[in-house]
A protein has these predicted regions:
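C-terminal structural segments of small proteins and small subunits
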Residues: 49-84
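Residue-level preference for short coil/turn positions at secondary-structure junctions
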Residues: 1-2, 62
Length: 84
């Protein structure tokens, strides 16, 4: 399992993803954004899953960025624009 961190453009994205993850029975945590990262809404979601599975949880227009987590290191995998 790999841990991924999702940042969102707003708290609406956090709430939508949390509900979807709960419904799927996924292992996740909602936390404050780490200090070394910047985010609009102040909250993020840590998701533990097999590499590749994180892609299905990207919410177009809601997800701002996706990171792979290794200890205190965050590797940026992708950034996404807000929905117009």
């Amino acid at each position: 399992m790999t841990t991924f961190l999702f940042l969102f453009h707003s708290t609406v994205g956090v709430v939508r993803m949390r509900k979807a993850l709960q419904a799927a029975g996924a292992s996740f945590r909602v936390k404050d954004i780490p200090r070394q990262l910047r985010g609009v809404c102040g909250l993020c979601i840590y998701l533990s899953c097999e590499p590749g599975e994180e892609q299905k949880w990207i919410l177009p227009g809601q997800t701002a960025a996706l990171f792979r987590v290794a200890g205190d290191d965050y590797q940026l995998l992708a950034q996404f624009p807000p929905q117009a």
